[in-house]
Design a protein with these regions (language model features):
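Loop-to-helix entry region of an early transmembrane alpha helix in multi-pass inner-membrane enzymes
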Residues: 74, 78-85, 90-111, 133, ...
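Transmembrane-helix signature of polytopic, membrane-embedded enzymes
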Residues: 95, 111-138, 156-157, 173-179
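Transmembrane-helix motifs of polytopic, lipid-linked glycan transferases
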Residues: 100-123, 161-165
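Short acidic/glycine- and proline-prone juxtamembrane loop motifs at membrane-interface regions
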Residues: 39, 141-155, 191
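Short helix- or helix-capping micro-motifs
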Residues: 21-27, 132-140, 164, 185-189, ...
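Extracytosolic helix-loop segments that constitute the early lumenal/periplasmic catalytic or substrate-binding loops
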Residues: 40-72, 79, 87
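Transmembrane signal-anchor helices characteristic of membrane glycosylation enzymes that use polyprenol
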Residues: 12-41, 223-236
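Membrane-interface transmembrane helices that cradle and orient dolichyl/undecaprenyl
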Residues: 123-126, 162-178, 188, 206-210
């Protein structure tokens, strides 16, 4: 009897999560077609072209004699540039390439709604969680962002995923959850350097209010550091600085 009830509730939750994802995709696909970017522009075009042609994350630089140099990128976090570069490996060209990126962002945004629902259930009832998840799915900026060549959708997805695993870690404290929190935290630092502060505050919160052991806190910091270490090493070699 207990197992039957458990499976019924589990199937019902999967059904709700699936509907949230499908609903969110249904809302976003027309926006991608109507308002989606037509191509890579400005710094994204330069960075991706240099990754494709020279296998280096760099900007073009012209000196006074109009000689062209590649100037390695320092000030822009690298993750989103590599994200859009990844889709170029499928030999897609023109609008097909751009649409693939935008649809992938729409999918990530839709999945983030389902994850947001699971986080909401920690604090609210199922009805309230479903209502605020639908509102979140329909939030105009969240809908529009997936139609642009911008890191917002990827950042939102990873941030929500981070907090989902963070709350799971506070409750269960397993090594696997330590790894997920650390790795996703590292990816977010590679996407937005300001996330260092959020990661630090989150770990401080877990340490003070939930008595998470110092060993686990240090392990999270270590794995996060390992995640971002290739970029740090590259900056030290090229610029003799870590940022």
């Amino acid at each position: 009897m207990f197992l039957d009830n458990y499976h019924h509730l589990k199937n019902k939750e999967i059904y709700v999560l699936t509907l949230l994802i499908l609903f969110s995709i249904f809302i976003r696909v027309p926006v991608v077609f109507l308002y989606g970017d037509a191509g890579l522009e400005n710094e994204w075009r330069i960075l991706v072209n240099n990754l494709i042609n020279h296998e280096i994350l760099a900007f073009d630089y012209h000196d006074g004699n109009l000689a062209e140099f590649l100037f390695p990128n320092l000030y822009m976090p690298p993750l989103y540039a590599y994200y859009i570069y990844f889709f170029s490996t499928f030999s897609l060209e023109g609008q097909n390439y751009i649409l693939t990126i935008l649809f992938s962002q729409a999918l990530l945004a839709s999945i983030s709604v389902a994850i947001f629902y699971k986080i909401s259930k920690i604090f609210f009832s199922k009805t309230i969680s479903l209502s605020i998840s639908l509102l979140y799915s329909l939030f105009p900026l969240h809908v529009y962002a997936c139609s642009q060549i911008s890191s917002i959708s990827l950042q939102t997805f990873l941030t929500i995923l981070f907090f989902y695993f963070f709350f799971q870690f506070i409750e269960k404290r397993s090594f696997l959850l330590v790894f997920f929190v650390s790795f996703i935290g590292g990816l977010l630092i590679l996407l937005r350097q300001e996330f260092v502060a959020i990661l630090a505050l989150s770990l401080l919160y877990a340490f003070i209010f939930y008595k998470i052991s110092l060993k686990k806190i240090l392990l999270i910091l270590l794995i996060s550091l390992i995640t971002i270490s290739p970029y740090l090493i590259r900056n030290i070699i090229v610029f003799e600085t870590v940022t």
